[in-house]
């Protein structure tokens, strides 16, 4: 994560100096989506079966039924599936990899 932070700062510095950080932006998108997916998967696995149920009503005001597992475990499965699509929207990771390759090989 520290490496991602430093890379982000480099991209910002590059943009501020007038250089378009095309390759840096693509690499940040790829790596950021992979990190988010892996951390959500790890968290889901660490919580175990209690991360599986998602009852949206439990987050509504006035919900007074017992939740399945700890309160923080409820949205984990939903978050996991939301983070799976990060590599697709905003330009799929495959497209971003093509941008990096073209930038690197000056195509």
PLM feature segments, named:
Residues 1-107:
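Alpha-helical interface subdomain recognition
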């Amino acid at each position: 994560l520290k490496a991602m932070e430093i890379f982000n700062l480099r991209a910002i510095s590059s943009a501020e100096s007038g250089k378009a950080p095309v390759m840096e932006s693509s690499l940040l998108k790829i790596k950021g989506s992979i990190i988010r997916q892996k951390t959500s998967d790890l968290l889901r696995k660490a919580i175990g079966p209690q991360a599986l149920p998602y009852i949206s009503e439990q987050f509504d005001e006035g919900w007074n039924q017992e939740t399945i597992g700890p309160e923080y475990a409820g949205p984990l499965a939903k978050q996991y599936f939301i983070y799976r699509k990060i590599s697709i929207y905003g330009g799929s990771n495959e497209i971003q990899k093509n941008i990096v390759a073209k930038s690197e090989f000056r195509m």
